[in-house]
Amino acid sequence: MVTVYSKNNCMQCKMVKKWLSEHEIAFDEINIDEQPEFVEKVIEMGFRAAPVITKDDFAFSGFRPSELAKLA
């Protein structure tokens, strides 16, 4: 399952979620503004900015369509 760690008022987060929906890729969203207990997990994965997208051992940050396509 794909997980998107997002934040409020984050344009790249919105773009990632829209791209995944348009390509019919199911995902869970964790909003780290609303669920701050996940901030430490994101930092431990080596990321400092949202969105962070994960699937199994694959993780990346930002709106990157070429990487998003690998999630299908």
Curated annotation (Swiss-Prot):
SUPFAM superfamilies: Thioredoxin-like. The keyword Electron transport applies. Residues 1-72 form the Glutaredoxin domain. Keywords: Disulfide bond, Electron transport, Redox-active center, Transport. It holds the Pfam family Glutaredoxin. Disulfide bonds join C10-C13. Electron transport system for the ribonucleotide reductase system NrdEF. This is Glutaredoxin-like protein NrdH. The gene is nrdH.
